[in-house]
Amino acid sequence: MKKFNIKSLTLLIVLLPLIVNANNIDSHLLEQNDIAKYVAQSDTVGSFFERFSALLNYPIVVSKQAAKKRISGEFDLSNPEEMLEKLTLLVGLIWYKDGNALYIYDSGELISKVILLENISLNYLIQYLKDANLYDHRYPIRGNISDKTFYISGPPALVELVANTATLLDKQVSSIGTDKVNFGVIKLKNTFVSDRTYNMRGEDIVIPGVATVVERLLNNGKALSNRQAQNDPMPPFNITQKVSEDSNDFSFSSVTNSSILEDVSLIAYPETNSILVKGNDQQIQIIRDIITQLDVAKRHIELSLWIIDIDKSELNNLGVNWQGTASFGDSFGASFNMSSSASISTLDGNKFIASVMALNQKKKANVVSRPVILTQENIPAIFDNNRTFYVSLVGERNSSLEHVTYGTLINVIPRFSSRGQIEMSLTIEDGTGNSQSNYNYNNENTSVLPEVGRTKISTIARVPQGKSLLIGGYTHETNSNEIISIPFLSSIPVIGNVFKYKTSNISNIVRVFLIQPREIKESSYYNTAEYKSLISEREIQKTTQIIPSETTLLEDEKSLVSYLNY
């Protein structure tokens, strides 16, 4: 009996920790609909993230100061990244992930550092960190562009990593040789390496590529051809554009000796949108630095153009006054920006179009055309709807064939100004001619050419977000002939002409141009949490049963369906 009690007591002592541990696991990890939940009961930050490390697939390093804090509560582990963001915000922690480990610090451990670059530009350093997936947008690098000095504040692991990277890259550039000839390939991601040419009414507009720009820089502008010099695609605006945080207008103060860039060869390779560089290592590094700063992503702008003809009397009834005000009903008003070359106003385009559509039902307005063009900032968008007639010029010994082109031409060069407003350089040409298909001949048997009228508007305007630009207001006369007849009676042969008559009407038509600019932002990654309430279980089942032969789902698809059903 005594031996039995000793054995029982020994077995109880051995199994007691296992029983307690099993109960502890059951109380901490609860499985509900295949989604893990964790209940923390005054756990330290270190012990909490030890259990959390496997879900993130990263080793977690917790500082001593952060490890002193304790956490209590129930946590949903279905989305570890989201839970990490919320938890660190509530507890007062900061973190940084370098791709190999997750570093967690107390918010009081945040450090700052000012670093001076000598041989590389700030943009080159930022681009290097982004390419290596080391840059954290939560802790941006802020710097003085002209002095190549930057400031960074964040978790110690991030600050030390950026400082060490900047020092290493600076030393690499300073140790580059200047004697050995080498070759480099620089690939562009956001802009074109070769020149682009647009034709506008027989005139070529050349937008220089990066290769041409860099070559002009190396040759002190001597490579600029006469054709390109006469057709500058982007005239300078009078308003200074505010430099944004992501601006890449960095200086090159490190290149003080112009002889450094002598004997450098550049060749554009459009097939891969790359530039081939021949020179020593230092020259290649300088060219790479320049191209990196020029190769920036441009924002997209959608331009909706409305060409509208409105009866002059109805336009006055709409309340448009080109001298300063416009009103549409009792609840809307707009102020106008006057120009010496055109009448311009910024207004709510949707309300104006609604009024035009109402007049269109009464045949008092007509939408002549409505093209939609997608372009990039600082890139011209051209709409040209023209007609051409040809004239033969016959002399005593030679002859030639000339042409005259007229129609509607709209050339818009948009750019973003301060406060997100869209600034546009506009050139509008509207031409009309008589509709004679054949030439008339006078008594001397000489052809009488048709008459062509042109109206040209050139201006610069700034449009706030969500507003439209109204341009025009010039009047022209139109002649319209209409035959009015009595049904059935007018179709009787011979005597039917008595029951119909012809009317002529001369009206004054005002042509206006409405331009609606809109920024097209890049689509972000799909967040299933946003669509969770929109997709029902029945729709998911229909989606998975479209192809009967597919009886199984991939693991990612199973996770998505499980998450949406939760």
Curated annotation (Swiss-Prot):
Keywords: Cell outer membrane, Membrane, Plasmid, Protein transport, Signal, Translocation, Transport, Virulence. Changing residue 296 to I: In plasmid pCP301. It is found in: Cell outer membrane. Disulfide bonds: none annotated. GO terms for biological process: protein secretion by the type III secretion system. The keyword Membrane applies. Transmembrane segments: none annotated. It comes from the Bacteria. The keyword Protein transport applies. Its main location: membrane. Disruption phenotype: Inactivated mutant strain is unable to invade HeLa cells and to provoke keratoconjunctivitis in guinea-pigs. It holds the Pfam family Secretin_N. One of its GO terms (cellular component) is type II protein secretion system complex. Residues 1-22 form the signal peptide. Belongs to the bacterial secretin family. T3SS SctC subfamily. NCBIfam families: type_III_yscC (TIGR02516). The core secretion machinery of the T3SS is composed of approximately 20 different proteins, including cytoplasmic components, a base, an export apparatus and a needle. This subunit is part of the base, which anchors the injectisome in the bacterial cell envelope. Forms a stable homooligomeric complex. Interacts with the pilotin MxiM/SctG and the inner membrane ring outer protein MxiJ/SctJ. Component of the type III secretion system (T3SS), also called injectisome, which is used to inject bacterial effector proteins into eukaryotic host cells. Forms a ring-shaped multimeric structure with an apparent central pore in the outer membrane. Necessary for the secretion of Ipa invasins. PANTHER family: PROBABLE GENERAL SECRETION PATHWAY PROTEIN D, SPI-1 TYPE 3 SECRETION SYSTEM SECRETIN. This is Type 3 secretion system secretin. It comes from Shigella flexneri.
